[in-house]
From Swiss-Prot:
Keywords: Acetylation, Methyltransferase, S-adenosyl-L-methionine, Transferase. This is Putative protein N-methyltransferase FAM86B2. It comes from Homo sapiens. Interacts with EEF2KMT. It is an enzyme of class 2 (transferase). SUPFAM superfamilies: S-adenosyl-L-methionine-dependent methyltransferases. The modification N-acetylmethionine is found at M1. Signal peptide: none annotated. GO terms for molecular function: protein-lysine N-methyltransferase activity. Its EC number is 2.1.1.-. Belongs to the class I-like SAM-binding methyltransferase superfamily. EEF2KMT family.
């Protein structure tokens, strides 16, 4: 295989691997590129490699997605193969049969591969979906912020980090594994999301602060219930963060006002210490919402500047979405 062709195949396999482990929508997979390669070769090795990068991946075997998702993926893979080759590939049907025989769990997993060779895995109970929270979803801005953090570890090394609206915990878990913070505080107002967060912290080999058997080389990790509207200075002063982060929390005008308010109270808690650095990442869905955020910041005397856009390198998120991140000075 020519070097250019080999590089293209590796890129294709990586695309399938990262999207499948992260349980991205099937339409986001590089199906057209796969079909083109299948037409150019009668060899079934590529499909076998895709199976090893997806349903047979060690991370998937340990922390599988839902049976339904795996079945839909394999069905689509078989369809693409049959559209090009008349001879069926027994291995595809064997794996599909194994998937159909598997018992559906109440937990589904999404995994994100890290540049260190490790991964972050999120376990999500289907029971949470019906309770009206957004914490079950891993928003694209959380992936964008996590990727930025991994590229800029100096912002977090040996520092105390407070995350507002942690949701499933992807960003914080990536920072804890890759950026060596001294302490990390996950926070969210919803009790069901907090329960999920604690489970994901433990699932990824980290210990909660109350666990005296924790790894001394790992950051001190806390999961805190924090409602921006009712949190008083005495509660916020216990955190004493050096860095505050938030991703995709600008979803309505009320949330924006609440966010700016809690940031002001956090700054007041630092007394004679330097105010924390603040990074807020978001997907630009509605320019008016972004304008409202910067207007509210200006009204409260909070300066801001946009961080330079970074290219997608590690995590699979919407390629055509407009992402932004602001660095705030409290």
């Amino acid at each position: 295989m020519a070097p250019e062709e080999n590089a293209g195949t590796e890129l294709l396999l990586q695309g399938f691997e990262r999207r499948f482990l992260a349980v991205r929508t099937l339409r986001s997979f590089p199906w057209q590129s796969l079909e083109a390669k299948l037409r150019d070769s009668s060899d079934s090795e590529l499909l076998r490699d895709i199976l090893q990068k997806t349903v047979r991946h060690p991370v998937c075997v340990k922390h599988p997605p839902s049976v339904k998702y795996a079945w839909c993926f394999l069905s689509e893979l078989i369809k693409k193969h049959e559209a090009v080759h008349t001879e069926p590939l027994d291995k595809l049907y064997e794996v599909l049969a194994e998937t159909l025989m598997a018992k559906e769990s109440t937990q589904g997993h999404r995994s994100y591969l890290l540049s260190s060779g490790g991964s972050v895995t999120l376990s999500k109970s289907t029971a949470i979906i019906s309770h009206g929270t957004t914490g079950l979803v891993t928003w694209d801005a959380a992936l964008y912020l996590a990727e930025w953090a991994i590229e800029n570890p100096a912002a977090f090394i040996n520092r105390t980090v407070l995350e507002l609206g942690s949701g499933a915990g992807l960003t914080g878990l990536a920072i804890c594994k890759m950026c060596r913070p001294r302490a990390y505080i996950f926070s969210d107002p919803h009790s069901r999301i907090l329960e999920q967060l604690r489970g994901n912290v433990l699932l990824n080999g980290l210990s909660l602060e109350a666990d005296i058997t924790g790894n001394l080389d790992s950051p001190r990790v806390t999961v805190a219930q924090l409602d921006w509207d009712v949190a008083m200075v005495h509660q916020l002063s216990a955190f004493q963060p050096d860095v505050v982060i938030a991703a995709d929390v600008l979803y309505c005008p009320e949330a924006i006002v609440s966010l700016v308010g809690v940031l002001q109270r956090l700054a007041a808690c630092r007394e004679h210490k330097r105010a924390p650095e603040v990074y807020v990442a978001f997907t630009v869905r509605n320019p008016e919402t972004c304008q409202l955020f910067t207007t509210e910041l200006g009204r409260d005397g909070i300066r801001w500047e946009a961080e330079a856009h970074h290219d997608q390198k590690l995590f699979p998120y919407g390629e055509h979405l407009e992402m932004a991140m602001l660095n705030l000075t409290l």
